[in-house]
Amino acid sequence: MSRLAENLRLTRPAARLPHTSRFSLKFLHAATLLLALLCALPATPLHANEIQVSSTRVWPAPDYTRVTIESPQAIRHTLFTLDNPQRLVLDLEGVALNTALNELAGKINATDPYVKGVRAGRFKPGVVRLVFDLKTQVKPEAFTLAPIAGYGHRLVLDVYPLTPPDPLLAFLNRREAGGNEPPAAPTAAEPAAAPPSAVTPATPPVALKPEATLPSKPAARPPRPGNERLIIVAIDPGHGGEDPGAIGRAGTQEKHITLSISQKLKERIDAEPNMRAVLTRTGDYFIPLHMRVEKARRAKADLFISVHADAFIKPSANGSSVFALSERGATSVAARWLAKRENDADLIGGVNIGVKDPHLRQTLLDLSQTATINDSLKVGKSVLQQMGGVNRLHKNHVEQAGFAVLKAPDIPSILIETAFISNPDEERKLRDPEHQNRLADAIVNGIKAYFAKNPPLAPAQVANSP
């Protein structure tokens, strides 16, 4: 029996595992399956919640360089400068270091007067750092803009020189000191090439030239009588930079048309023996409305002309118009609509409302403007009559509305709508260089006719005989 019992003991099933051991095996099996499922899923980015910058743009100008960073959400940022060498640091919080930021370095132009280059990198977790290498000491400003007119959230960096350039004032000082030769005019005109149809350009065209001042006297210019002084005309090409203005159906941007026509107008005014012209902008960059007026005042301008090619709700709207400032409201619904649209240029182009500018308060004050408005209506009528020989007139009289850019209390000012870029036929005309020449001829003839009947009274500081 003992041997049988021993055999039974050797052949019986193994003892069962304890309950806790069986649970551990099941848990291990489930964990293995879960790990396999996780490995099969697509990888999730480590910084999935970071803001993706959609585009970057750089707008170099004689007065300042603007860098725009556009994104679907507002970006928190920190700005400071470093010395030895001169650098500007912009830290972006919660932003991904993506292609748009890495491409920023390639958008800095060698002719930029203030920025030499830029480097982008991950400074620490959650912070992307942009380091701008500078050519001079600067006074930077950074501010944000809410979405408007097809743009998303924008972080705007304006790089101003520590000592602002003022070529117009420098010219005045040279004249007071006895220097007779005005600075040379730009040698090449900027073409009005067909712009992209999108509101936001990928890489803005860069064509930096010195800020336009009074041009050199042409060799064949006849002498002026001793008591006749120069008549200074400030020409303001509407829009520019971040603000494309109206856009035609073929993709033509107003800012390019206005600059091209203004340059042609300047050439014709400078060819007159008793006239000189200054441009508020000479390239594709943005200037706030009040600074356009301030540039004209610094030049001691006798006349301010803002050139536009606007749009209306209906594409059938057509014809040329001339506007002057109104103290009592707009003279028509269209005039009110156009004035609101032009006055919104600062919102689209981007103005730092956090900076208290004394010039802004000064130029937007409606002082005693009755006499100035009367002169504006006179010159506007003269120009409108001449333009009627080139294009159909939208209205046969000068309209009035509250255009902010016309609020210089001491300079007769008009705003010219050369045509409606929203009208396909007129858009084609506006793109035609010959039609632009005819418009410029008509405008300068209207200016000459006005000053022939209304010569400027007080001698201008800038008008000593050359």
Where are the language model's segments positioned?
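Signal-peptide-cleaved, periplasmic/extracellular N-terminal interaction regions immediately downstream
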Residues: 2-8, 27, 46-232
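Flexible glycine-/small-residue-rich
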Residues: 71-73, 92-94, 134-136, 158-161, ...
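Structured segments of extracytoplasmic/periplasmic soluble domains
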Residues: 59, 72, 78, 135-137, ...
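Bacterial N-terminal signal peptides
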Residues: 26-42
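Short, low-complexity intrinsically disordered segments enriched in A/P/G/S/L with frequent Arg
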Residues: 2, 13-18
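Active-site-adjacent mobile loop/cap segments within catalytic or ligand-binding domains
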Residues: 79, 303, 313, 364-466
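Short, solvent-exposed loop/turn elements at domain surfaces
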Residues: 78-79, 99-100, 242-246, 424
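Catalytic-core regions of hydrolytic enzymes
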Residues: 196-358, 369-381, 428, 437, ...
